[in-house]
């Protein structure tokens, strides 16, 4: 049994998108989407910080210069270490009011990012790619309802993507630019809602389940191999961190259930016995 403990007791309405940076992968960063916050904590020193934007922030992807790419509702935007904001290419005008949700950087440096409509209109959202130099945005998938977890296999040739309300994980072939050959590799029950995810160093998929109180690992053959139970309902995402990338950090949401679960919205940490991959930074 893998036991968890509280890593950070700041309660997030909707904690999401953890990343680990720094020389020892010890600087954790994540967002509280609906409060527009970007939070951080150092594993080794326990030093914390945060800043707040004036709109919802779906993700905060670290940049090589120390700033972030922020998935603000009207973005995405670049934010430097001094807080200065500059724009990136925008997606097409939304038919339905939408925001950015999850994102990750490929090994080639491109930013993959997805959307959701606030009313969760079926197939009204998409998955996009912003080029590593920030000059171009391209829509990769258009039949998306709630774009969520995404990551790549260790050899980078397989791209994984979760559209939460479809209740499965899709895999694609990836050539460093395009995604092709879409196929479903893991199916869940209609009451199971997969959220954020990450891939470990053995090609296992660690998936957080919204309203499921769990993070699960599926091995390289897509078979369930581990379960991590949490004392909250809404687990949202996870990432590996620490000098040896052997610690799994898990974000959660309180979703107005702090009375039912006192630790709801806090961020947790555990040692699952498997090492992960480093966070890839965005280069501009």
Regions found by a protein language model. Name each.
Residues 21-23, 28-34, 69-74, 113-121, ...:
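Conserved beta-strand positions in repeat-built beta-propeller and related beta-rich domains
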Residues 239-284:
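Blade-level signature of beta-propeller repeat domains, shared across WD40, Kelch, NHL, RCC1
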């Amino acid at each position: 049994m893998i036991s968890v403990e509280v890593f950070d007791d700041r309660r997030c309405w909707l904690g999401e998108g953890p990343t680990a940076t720094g020389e020892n992968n010890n600087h954790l960063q994540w967002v509280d989407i609906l409060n527009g916050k970007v939070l951080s904590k150092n594993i080794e020193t326990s030093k914390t910080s945060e800043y707040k934007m004036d709109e919802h922030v779906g993700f905060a992807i670290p940049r090589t210069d120390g700033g972030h790419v922020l998935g603000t509702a009207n973005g995405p935007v670049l934010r430097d270490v001094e807080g200065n904001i500059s724009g990136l290419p925008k997606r097409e005008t939304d038919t339905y009011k939408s925001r950015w949700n999850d994102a990750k950087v490929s090994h080639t440096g491109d930013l993959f990012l997805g959307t959701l409509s606030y009313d969760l209109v079926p197939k009204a959202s998409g998955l996009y790619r912003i080029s590593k130099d920030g000059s171009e945005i391209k829509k990769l998938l258009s039949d998306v309802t709630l774009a969520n977890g995404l990551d790549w296999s260790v050899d980078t040739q397989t791209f994984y993507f979760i559209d939460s309300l479809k209740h499965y994980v899709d895999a694609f072939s990836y050539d460093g630019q395009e995604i092709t050959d879409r196929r479903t590799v893991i199916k869940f029950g209609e009451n199971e809602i997969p959220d954020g995810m990450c891939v470990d160093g053995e090609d296992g998929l660690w998936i957080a389940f919204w309203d499921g109180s769990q993070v699960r690992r599926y091995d390289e053959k897509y078979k369930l191999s581990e379960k991590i139970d949490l004392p909250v309902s809404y687990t949202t995402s996870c990432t590996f961190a620490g000098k040896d990338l052997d610690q799994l950090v898990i974000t959660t949401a309180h979703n107005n259930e702090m009375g039912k679960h006192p630790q709801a919205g806090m961020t947790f940490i555990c040692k699952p016995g498997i090492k992960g991959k480093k966070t890839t930074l965005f280069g501009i």
